[in-house]
Curated annotation (Swiss-Prot):
Lineage: Eukaryota, Fungi, Dikarya, Ascomycota, Pezizomycotina
Compositionally biased intervals (Basic and acidic residues): 359-368, 389-405
GO CC annotation, single: Golgi apparatus
Domain DHHC: 91-141
Residues that span the membrane, as ranges: 11-31, 49-69, 130-150, 180-200
Membrane disposition: Multi-pass membrane protein
Name assigned to this protein: Palmitoyltransferase pfa4
Length: 435
């Protein structure tokens, strides 16, 4: 019986290694004994050189540290930080108890904020980030090139076997060889198809300087714009606030050449982009990124999202009270149902700060607003219903934030609860610099 701590994800790297070895080396054994069309010497060299490149790039994609936010790091742009706080953007990570740089996200698996996090890849058991993306992209490139080359060699043998299908069996390959060829060809073809799609997606991200998480954020922003147009340009936020939604351009698309250069470690040497032993991007980078200047300098990404704005402090929320309505026209009577609803909503708002107040999906809240429910009743849902909260919003491909390895609670419900000690420390540092 497997131990309770065992996870299937631990088998991912061994499975990939077995697949690489199976395609790269058992295929050569097959070619060695396939008398009708043995491999030429130059073909053997090509297969093995490509296999070495795949092994090196995969090893580095698995083992290179995806990076972390330096202890005590603070944003250098104070004006943007103030604007972020005003708009509710999550720049403070409650999990790490530290500021998050632009494009950084808290990975649930790595349990830290990762600079320019793209996604947590289950096949490398590592985050694809500012520091590991070049190795990951090279691995995909050499894997597709190597598998495509092997596909052409296998197809030649498949064609020969098919062309001699009417000859006596003793003149052709054995049943074991045919079975081996069939398994090699099917496995290689399926792997080539899957990795080709992933490589194309990665190249698109590289050319547009957009991570998979940011692609999700762009689609989320477009959804919020459509919702806002239906409701007069604004959307309701927590605590009954109204958030004006305007179109915001993605700031990190700085031109295809500059995008590729930035994604591949900042080097302008094209050959280094393909070199398996190329150095990892400098560890001093990954905290600030060049922008295209289409938006005001104080505006940061991602755009304001009413469902990701922190709940107002307790002293700024509505205090507990009951509704008194005059149903008879002569004397006030207590509406018991409204009283109980307000009481339950107030108790939910007064939970311990470690608990999460989840927001219901937009279509549910919209229906409840139209039915006359109060903001507090319509806003928050049960903790047990987490899979159906607004943090479960999916893009057109059916992906939600947790599919990229992101800690959804930290991204959607993290409060700007910056410790008082840190605020005092920041103030003292500013006073020291001004002297």
């Amino acid at each position: 019986m497997l131990c309770s701590s065992f996870s299937v994800s631990r088998l991912a790297i061994p499975a990939v290694c077995i697949l690489i070895a199976f395609l790269a080396y058992t295929s050569q054994i097959f070619f060695l004994y396939f008398e009708d069309a043995p491999l030429k010497e130059d073909e053997v060299w090509r297969i093995n050189i490509l296999a070495i490149c795949i092994w090196i790039c995969y090893y580095r994609a698995c083992t290179v540290d995806p990076g972390h936010v330096p202890k005590g790091w603070m944003p250098s742009d104070r004006e943007r930080l103030k604007a972020d706080r005003a708009s509710g953007r999550q720049r403070w990570c409650r999990r790490c108890e530290a500021y998050k740089p632009p494009r950084a996200h808290h990975c649930k698996t790595c349990e830290r904020c990762v600079p320019k996090m793209d996604h947590h890849c289950p096949w490398t058991s590592n985050c694809v980030s500012h520091f590991t993306f070049p190795h990951f992209a090279r691995f995909l490139f050499y894997a597709v090139v190597g598998i495509a080359y092997l596909e052409t060699r296998l197809w030649q043998r498949v064609s020969k076997v098919w062309g001699s299908r009417h000859l006596p069996s003793y003149l052709g390959p054995s049943m074991g060889q045919i079975g081996h060829l069939f398994v090699l060809f099917v496995t290689n073809s399926l792997t080539l198809f899957a990795l080709s799609l992933l490589l194309l997606r990665t190249l698109w991200s590289l050319g547009s300087n957009t991570t998979t998480i940011e692609s999700w954020e762009i689609e989320r922003h477009e959804t919020l714009l459509r919702r806002a147009r239906r409701l007069g340009g604004s959307l309701p936020g927590p605590g009954g606030i109204s958030v004006h939604i305007t179109k915001q351009e993605f700031p990190y698309d700085i031109g295809i050449w500059s995008n590729i250069r930035a994604g591949m470690g900042g080097s302008a040497n094209v050959l280094s982009w393909f070199w398996p032993l190329a150095r990892t991007p400098d560890r001093s980078t990954g905290l600030e990124f060049e922008e295209n200047g289409f938006e005001d300098p104080t505006v940061s990404w991602p755009p304001p999202d009413p469902d990701r704005i922190p709940l107002p402090p307790m002293d700024q929320r509505d205090s507990f009270m009951y509704d008194i309505t005059d149903t008879s026209g002569t004397s006030g009577q207590i509406d018991i149902e409204a009283f109980n609803r307000r009481k339950e909503a107030d108790l939910r708002r007064r939970r311990a700060p470690t608990e999460i107040e989840r927001r219901k999906p937009f279509h549910v809240r919209l229906e409840e607003y139209s039915n006359g429910s109060s903001d507090a009743e319509a806003d928050t849902g049960s903790d047990d219903d987490s899979d159906h909260g607004e943090e479960g919003w999916k893009n057109s491909e059916g992906e939600r934030l947790r599919d990229f390895g992101v800690d959804e609670e930290a991204e959607f419900y993290d409060e700007e609860d910056i410790p008082l000690a840190l605020l005092i420390q920041q103030r003292a540092k500013r006073q020291h610099l001004s002297q």
